[in-house]
Amino acid sequence: MKTIIAVTIFGILTCAYAAEGDDCSIEKAMGDFKPEEFFNGTWYLAHGPGVTSPAVCQKFTTSGSKGFTQIVEIGYNKFESNVKFQCNQVDNKNGEQYSFKCKSSDNTEFEADFTFISVSYDNFALVCRSITFTSQPKEDDYLVLERTKSDTDPDAKEIC
């Protein structure tokens, strides 16, 4: 009987915490993240919200005189309209979360925070991305990025 009660309580707690959704603020970033290697070249979205459609291309470049500042350019193709975003790094919270202020080609502004959980600089990255729009609640999602375009979306290279 004690086992049944314990399993039931565990199941209820599991469902309760799973229902809350993703929360990037509680994620632990990888300790040896090398931003100069990650923020270089092109990344493709392999798994995340909307991965089957639209195609998402992420280009990361570095610039700046002291250290470096990341500039993120994202091509986003949805409903046959191509929207581009440019994000400028504004902060590096606790050395773990990279914060950006972003503006789209259609003048939408938002803030994006990236927590890098696991990265193989030549192949893949597991990232927790938090986006905050001024008039909407914060949205946290886990993304799997890859260096080479997979065959899941043939249009991805065209928008990069």
UniProtKB/Swiss-Prot annotation:
Q: Which keywords belong to this entry?
A: Blood coagulation cascade inhibiting toxin, Disulfide bond, Hemostasis impairing toxin, Platelet aggregation inhibiting toxin, Protease inhibitor, Secreted, Serine protease inhibitor, Signal, Toxin, Vasoactive
Span of the signal peptide: 1-18
Q: Name one GO molecular function term.
A: toxin activity
Disulfide pattern: C24-C128, C57-C160, C87-C102
Q: In which tissues is it expressed?
A: Expressed in salivary glands.
Please give the GO cellular component terms listed in this UniProt entry.
extracellular region
GO BP, one example? blood vessel diameter maintenance
Compartments reported by the entry: Secreted
Tell me where on the tree of life, at the top rank, the source sits: Eukaryota
Q: What is the effect of changing F124L?
A: Moderately decreases inhibitory activity towards thrombin
Q: What else is known?
A: The sequence shown is that of clone TR5.
What family does the entry list?
A: Belongs to the calycin superfamily. Triabin family.
Biological function: Thrombin inhibitor. Forms a non-covalent complex with thrombin at a molar ratio of 1:1. Inhibits thrombin-induced platelet aggregation. Prolongs thrombin clotting time and activated partial thromboplastin time. It only minimally suppresses the amidolytic activity of thrombin. Inhibits thrombin-mediated fibrin formation in the host. Inhibits thrombin-induced endothelium-dependent relaxant and contractile responses in host blood vessels. Inhibits thrombin-induced mitogenesis in host vascular smooth muscle cells.
UniProt protein name: Triabin
